[in-house]
């Protein structure tokens, strides 16, 4: 019997439930089974998020990269990759990811905020202030 996209969606939902209950290995199995049926950015995003939760940052980046390959216009994927790169102190790469998330979704206040924090950390006060001002503007609206 050939598995369908519906089966893949069910496996992803099961994987998400496994994550909620801390059954990470089983979640990975479900995501991998789903990926054998159909490769989607969403599945790679979920798998990447799980790797972040378990502090497997390089694996998370690989999943986000694959998700970006499949859907380069998803701002959440770029944002999540930026967060991981921040965690492993690859600040310039993280800023590039936040920039891409902002390019795709100009009102993405979390991306603006994280970019501002990194710019501040790098001593780029003027650029950081511009980003913080954008966050304030977005939060007011």
Predicted regions and their residues:
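Conserved structural position within tetratricopeptide repeats
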Residues: 2, 33-36, 65-69, 99-103, ...
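Register position in tetratricopeptide repeats
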Residues: 20, 53-54, 87-88, 121
């Amino acid at each position: 019997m050939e598995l369908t996209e519906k089966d893949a969606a069910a496996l992803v939902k099961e994987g998400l439930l496994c994550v909620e209950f801390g059954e990470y290995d089983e979640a990975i199995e479900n995501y991998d089974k789903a990926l054998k049926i159909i490769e989607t950015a969403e599945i790679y995003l979920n798998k990447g998020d799980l790797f972040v939760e378990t502090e497997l940052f390089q694996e998370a980046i690989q999943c986000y990269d694959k998700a970006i390959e499949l859907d380069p216009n998803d701002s959440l994927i770029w944002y999540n990759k930026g967060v991981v790169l921040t965690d492993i102190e690859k600040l310039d790469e993280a800023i590039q990811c936040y920039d891409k998330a902002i390019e795709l979704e100009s009102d993405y206040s979390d991306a603006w905020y994280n970019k501002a924090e990194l710019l501040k950390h790098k001593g780029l006060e003027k650029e950081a202030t511009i980003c913080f001002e954008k966050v304030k503007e977005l939060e007011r609206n």
